[in-house]
Amino acid sequence: RVLPALIAAGEKLAAEFVAPRLWMDPHTADGGYMSSWASDREYALWRSYRSIDIANELGTDMIVLWLAREGTLCAESKSPVASTRLLIDAINQMLAYDPKVRIVIEPKPNEPIDRSICGTIGHAMAISAATNDPARVGGNVESAHAILAGLDPSHEMGFALALGKLWTVHLNDQNGIRFDQDKSFGVENLRQAFNQVKLLVENNYGAHGEYVGLDVKAMRTTTDADGYKHLENSLAVARALEDKVAKFDYAYQQKCVETRDYEGLEMYTLRLLMGIEG
């Protein structure tokens, strides 16, 4: 069903990546790649190989690994050292399965697992460096996942960008350290959203074919008639923030940095976002 739809859409639609979706099966209740049971690890790899085959059919070389259950529900149940090595080994096997595939790690600090073993983009970059082919292992930053880790999404994105490893991004928002809410982009922290867009624009993100995704969910009160509003709103906010970035006064920014007038720079940014003159 998917491939004919892509062909019919032509250049308007493409498959960015395929994901093994390991968090939904009883085999992976206690992890897939990091499971204490060899049969579960074999199942996780089987789904990963199958995802690579599907990706090839759909014309993409990218596999995104959201490590949803790769960690511990009981801290004493697993060795973080052995578990990390299991993940590296699993990625190496995927790299060996297809010499062209790219593996993209999407980190998250918790939920549905209690304690993730690869919780931030820094962890993902370290895993990448430890594989047999680091050039084919990158990262995906989701805004809400960074916030759940108590980190700034733009800093997480910038860290991966500096290493040439930010191969996709998922924009959304999050109200503090709760469950993963996947709120519409910018609804909780507009300034934080602005800085994510600013970072991507400044670094010409997308020039090499990278995608910017909107990983957002509708509110539970949303009617079927309004079922796409969360997507429409998120896209509208992202585009509006692009316009704000285009108006950002970098000369004034530099002046404030040179004099360490961060109060002035902060207020300038707020005025820009609120549309206040002066």
Predicted regions: what is each one?
Residues 1, 15-20, 194, 198:
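Metal-cofactor-binding active-site regions of metalloenzymes
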Residues 1, 23-28:
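Short active-site-adjacent helix-start/loop capping segments
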Residues 1-10:
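Basic, amphipathic N-terminal segments that precede the first structured/catalytic domain
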Residues 9-11, 15-17, 26-138, 266-268:
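Active-site acidic/histidine proton-transfer and metal-coordination neighborhood
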Residues 19-24, 67-71, 107-111, 143-147, ...:
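Active-site-proximal loop/turn and secondary-structure-junction residues that shape catalytic pockets
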Residues 53, 89-93, 97-102, 117-278:
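Histidine-acidic metal/acid-base catalytic patches
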